[in-house]
Amino acid sequence: MSVRTYADCQSVCTGYSFATKGGMQGMSAMDSALEQVRCVTGGDVFGADCFAAGNVWINGSTIADEGCACEGVELDASGCYVIPGLIDLHFHGCMGDDLSDASAEGLHRMAAYEAKRGITAICPASMTLPHDRLMAIMGNVGAFEAEAAEAELVGMNMEGPYISPDKVGAQNPEYVRAASIEEFTELQQAACGRIKLVDVAPEEPGNLDFIREMHDKVRISLAHMCADYDTAKTA
């Protein structure tokens, strides 16, 4: 399992998180001292099919055998489960902040909160919004660099505006529009390539053309749609 190393302070997230045995209210391994971590000790480590008492040894940016572990501090996980770091693939915000606010400080607060809940990687979602607001969001995402004790931003989910006006859910139907290769390309450039998922309603006019052209450039998610089986299969 890979390990995340923070180049700015040389602390390490082992790719594991701590959780108290009463629930996921403990701290993430990223919430540790800002030093090189050598080992997570004393916890019940999640394995192939069960938890077992054990240690997690670290060498730089990878999980290692004990004899190959690097020099550094040991984290005491006594009384905790030690699990693989969780990945949050779809959330809009937390702690009063939202990705669509396009706030650098807000995105850092979101990443810090997620890390404290055992989530070591995040892929937050934007809303259906006008072009200028989406550009601001993408610029904020493109410039983001996680700090110590924050979850890593591994990408983002563009949930709209290329959806069905009849299946908007909590989205604003005023800003729903046909999928645009030109617009998406501009947004992706602003996000520095961090848009990893884009929601598309394939039955809407022109959207199948978008899917055909862009499916090898970004992962397409069929969502907020009224498509029948045949249309979805074609997409």
Predicted segments, located by residue:
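Aromatic (phenylalanine/tyrosine) cluster motif
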Residues: 6, 16-18
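Histidine-rich, glycine-flanked metal-binding segment
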Residues: 27-83
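Di-metal (Zn2+ and/or Mg2+/Mn2+) metal-binding site signature of metallo-dependent hydrolases
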Residues: 80-102
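Active-site gating loops and adjacent loop-to-helix segments of metal-dependent hydrolytic enzymes
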Residues: 89, 112-123, 164-192, 234
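Divalent metal-dependent hydrolysis catalytic cores, especially in the metallo-beta-lactamase
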Residues: 92, 108-137, 151-164, 191-203, ...
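Metal-dependent catalytic neighborhoods of phosphoester/phosphodiester hydrolases
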Residues: 99, 132-142, 169
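Histidine/acidic residue-rich metal-binding segments in metalloenzymes
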Residues: 177-235
